[in-house]
Amino acid sequence: MVFDSFDIKSLIRPVIDFPKPGVIFRDITPLFQSPKALRLVMDSFAHRYVEADFTHIGAMDARGFLIGSVLAYQLNKPLVLFRKQGKLPADVLAEGYATEYGEAFLEVHADSLCEGDSVVMFDDLIATGGTLIAAANLIRRMGARVHEAAAIIDLPELGGSQRLEDMGIPTFCLTQFALTDK
């Protein structure tokens, strides 16, 4: 498969000073507005995981849902949703974490995974790693393991990918940006 990181990067819109001054937000919605780019992103992930040994797709609220749901369908895997606090209706497990903007809680239905399950976690971007680390902790609390954490974008200067690697969780991203890239 041919993958061009430049094409992907050119369709990720930088939004300066959002959600707060000094932050450059990486907006992936232009990728989803281009059928060719969307197919390239999803096919790249599907190609990586089609023969991998894992049982579930884990998708992070909210943009990770866009990736995870398509891949769960393509790869015929159960989808586990990791939601912001108060969004799930049944019994949940919760995990607190720090974000680049403050503190939050991540929740998952307590019956989503069983001992021995293996999860590929998806989000749109890895910044500090807070969301994915919280999800990994929830996965492990249910007796399952993390196969890999994946995202479209890595912001390596914020250290999230390294934090995940330090926990024994491999990471995979389609592209990366320096914090000052516009």
Curated annotation (Swiss-Prot):
It is found in: Cytoplasm. Belongs to the purine/pyrimidine phosphoribosyltransferase family. This is Adenine phosphoribosyltransferase. GO terms for biological process: adenine salvage; AMP salvage; purine ribonucleoside salvage. SUPFAM superfamilies: PRTase-like (SSF53271). Keywords: Cytoplasm, Glycosyltransferase, Purine salvage, Transferase. Homodimer. InterPro entries: Ade_phspho_trans, PRibTrfase_dom, PRTase-like, UPRTase/APRTase. It catalyses: AMP + diphosphate = 5-phospho-alpha-D-ribose 1-diphosphate + adenine. Its EC number is 2.4.2.7. Catalyzes a salvage reaction resulting in the formation of AMP, that is energically less costly than de novo synthesis. PROSITE patterns: PUR_PYR_PR_TRANSFER. Pathway: Purine metabolism; AMP biosynthesis via salvage pathway; AMP from adenine: step 1/1. One of its GO terms (molecular function) is adenine binding. Coiled coil: none annotated. One of its GO terms (cellular component) is cytoplasm. NCBIfam families: apt, PRK02304.1-3, PRK02304.1-5.
